[in-house]
Amino acid sequence: MDARATIPEHIARTVILPQGYADDEVIYPAFKWLRDEQPLAMAHIEGYDPMWIATKHADVMQIGKQPGLFSNAEGSEILYDQNNEAFMRSISGGCPHVIDSLTSMDPPTHTAYRGLTLNWFQPASIRKLEENIRRIAQASVQRLLDFDGECDFMTDCALYYPLHVVMTALGVPEDDEPLMLKLTQDFFGVHEPDEQAVAAPRQSADEAARRFHETIATFYDYFNGFTVDRRSCPKDDVMSLLANSKLDGNYIDDKYINAYYVAIATAGHDTTSSSSGGAIIGLSRNPEQLALAKSDPALIPRLVDEAVRWTAPVKSFMRTALADTEVRGQNIKRGDRIMLSYPSANRDEEVFSNPDEFDITRFPNRHLGFGWGAHMCLGQHLAKLEMKIFFEELLPKLKSVELSGPPRLVATNFVGGPKNVPIRFTKA
């Protein structure tokens, strides 16, 4: 065993295995212990390759802003166990990536492909969507209010609003949104028994990997026809932009276009719904914060940022060292794998006072919920806008909100958040 592997096994298992993320009272104390005792250290647990775990805000930023040294392309950017990793490579010709998305690229390739939609996702561009987003938000708020005082915020509201927004932006017909919801949940839910299409107590790693591959294939089959359609009949949507984009004078290969579609459809939906659910949990547990937001709508953008920080819907991304280097006094060797922990970075006491508290007055809020560096979330401005509009529409119509039962969290070390948020509310 590598002498640098110093993290106690029970701590390492908590922060590496998906199950640890299903309980905030387990995962956050483990991260605090690491920040205090071993902020950057290597871990070995059965079934996973050795990895460094970066838990400090400064280290996650330092690694994230150096794509030339810490690569997304060299190894999988998703934390897989060894069985999943082997299966993914077996179906992709030895490549560590199942889809050729932005998150699996390094500059200059990443720069070129990200540049195709960069302007579309800038604040000035997405303002044209505001009227339509507000209409969708108003319908979603009314849907919630129609439950007449009690509902599950996630399954009755939060899953559908961001899905409708991002599918509208992408250009997916509204009738196909249920399919997109299922595929998105399958994409992020391979570790979650409740999200499995196969009615089995628990999938083996190989079964989970096969289902993931099947989900990708279904996504690609669905999107293939749209590329042809948008080239002959372009519309004002992201699919039309990508279908008609060229690099070096040629249309983009279908595998890259489809991967782009999948990335927008999945990341643009699940992260926003998770953060919205986190916001409702925070407001329910802290009624004084709800009163503040209702009395001063100017605080709603801060509410949005605090929800992203506090919920941290992206749990981890992986990097691979391209050369020997040093971070926080630790010798990182070429080929070493590093897990970047965004939930831990977002609760770093050196950056955030009272980091475990949900505080919508927190400013500045230097959270890393949207990542950092070249791979910082492309759709962050759209996500912030849709959450801002949603709470602008919802809060004036609420007198109070409280949890009517314990929230349940998704068990995932990749992307996820609240799975169920049962609430009781009174209308204003």
Curated annotation (Swiss-Prot):
Q: Does the keyword Aminoacyl-tRNA synthetase apply?
A: no
| PROSITE patterns tied to this protein | CYTOCHROME_P450
Transmembrane regions listed in the UniProt entry: none
GO cellular component terms listed in the entry, alphabetical order = cytoplasm
What InterPro entries does the record tag this protein with?
A: Cyt_P450, Cyt_P450_B, Cyt_P450_CS, Cyt_P450_sf
- Record-listed E.C. numbers: 1.14.-.-
Which classification does the entry list for the species? Bacteria, Pseudomonadati, Pseudomonadota, Gammaproteobacteria, Pseudomonadales
Q: What is its main location?
A: cytoplasm
**Which protein are we looking at?**
Cytochrome P450-terp
Cofactor(s) demanded: heme
Q: Identify the coding gene.
A: cyp108
Q: Which domain of life is it from?
A: Bacteria
Gene3D superfamilies in the cross-refs: Cytochrome P450
Q: Origin organism of this chain?
A: Pseudomonas sp
Protein residues bound to heme: 377
Family under the similarity heading? Belongs to the cytochrome P450 family.
* Alphabetized GO MF terms: heme binding; iron ion binding; monooxygenase activity; oxidoreductase activity, acting on paired donors, with incorporation or reduction of molecular oxygen
- SUPFAM superfamilies linked: Cytochrome P450
Q: Which CDD domains match?
A: CYP142-like (cd11033)
Q: What function does this protein fulfil?
A: Catalyzes the hydroxylation of alpha-terpineol.
Q: Where in the cell is it found?
A: Cytoplasm
Record keywords, A-Z: Cytoplasm, Heme, Iron, Metal-binding, Monooxygenase, Oxidoreductase
